[in-house]
Amino acid sequence: MKYYLAIDIGASSGRHIIGYLKNGGIQSEEVYRFRNGMIRKDGHLVWDMQHILYEVIRGIKEAFKKYPVIESLSIDTWGVDYVLMHGEKEIWPCFGYRDERTDDDINEVWKIIPFTELYTRTGCQFQKFNTIYQLYDDKQHGRLEEADDFLMIPEYLIYKLTGQRVREYTNATTTGLLNLETGGYDHYIIEKLGLPSGLFPKLDQPKMNVGCLSEEVAKEVNGNLNVVLCATHDTGSAVEGIEMEDDELYLSSGTWSLLGVKLKEGIADNDSMMNNYTNEGGIGYIRYQKNIMGMWVINELKKELCPEKSFDEIVKMAEQSSYNGLVDVNLPAFLSPSSMKKVFDDILGEHLETGDYFRCAYRSLAGCYAKTVEEIEHNTKREYHKLYIVGGGAKNHYLNRLTEEMSGKKVIALPIESSAIGNIKVQMEVEYEL
């Protein structure tokens, strides 16, 4: 039996998951987990990449303890963020997407290239933290003067494990710098913004064999294996992990909720732009989807209002509430507030009981999902009948029920580590086991 290691890192935790083929299906076992999160340093929200790398290596070592022979590993993470490099040296810090540094850069970028033109060329939604705005901020503050490379988070981790540099396609589609038609970097945009063209080489595709662990890392983890490219953007891997048809929708429900469909070609028309849809790369298809604030809202309310309670207890409180107020969870105020409760209070104009906050949040999320389904059907001129939900949110029966009621679609919850399954699936395809 062959074993594969998926390293799936999200904004709040990282997981090392062993996968293998049994009875015609992919079986998985978590062998290591660690906490993740941005830290505040010098007034900015940043990622502690040294700590993340330490945990990645520690998890590989734990995997080898239990499974001495592993065929390969692959890494998927969140998108948009990156590490600037000068030769072999990192240019710190590694800013996190919730940092506010790009607030003053967005209009400056749009003065150079109007957003309508950006969207038509890239098909990439507006998010204030998209890589395009982060790199422009780096340029404005002189951080690109010594940079000769930038590596997205999974690419940086692969580099530290193997010594090899790759630039993977699916994650690059989150940058706002790729041309939707060509699938490569749009050098017209890059030149107009004055970004160094040398930072943007040809992209690598999933299923590429990168190579083995470096001698130093192999010695530290007591083993060696191949490193391959999966869809390194975690949502790309999550969608790969769902067995679905073309007339079905997916919802990757975690810190963010990403609701969309698989298309042969992207859509960058005015309706898509006005409703902030994005076209992200999949393996042989485009993921036409919308980013919704997601379980971040629930987690922040829990942290503030009742950290001692379990999520089951929170759901019970929400079910017992009769409050019917709703909020637009996609408002910028929800992105990185000092108090999530205060955001609700300010929007609703009243203070609520604890259970009411959660009922409002869950119903607002479900309502946003339903509205998004309607928009997708309108924009793609197709009707969809099933909605597959994967990720941590798939375990929330209350939110799933609300989503089914409000959307009118059959909800199929798959409480699996879908990103890890998709990650492992690609590794198996590289080994010709699938």
Mark where each language-model region is.
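N-terminal glycine/serine-rich phosphate-binding loop of ATP-dependent small-molecule kinases
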Residues: 1-93, 146, 218-227, 401, ...
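Short beta-strand-loop/turn "lid" adjacent to the catalytic site in phosphate-handling enzymes
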Residues: 65-97, 125-129, 158-179, 202-205
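Glycine-rich beta-strand-to-loop/alpha-helix junction loops that act as flexible
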Residues: 76-81, 206-207, 253-256, 386-394
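Short glycine/proline- and acidic residue-enriched helix-loop micro-motifs
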Residues: 42-45, 115-125, 199
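Short glycine-rich phosphate-binding loop at a beta-alpha junction
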Residues: 69-77, 149, 202, 379-392
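Short alpha-helix plus adjacent loop in nuclease-associated cores
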Residues: 96-112
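Active-site core segments that coordinate phosphate-bearing ligands/cofactors
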Residues: 5-6, 18, 110-122, 136-148, ...
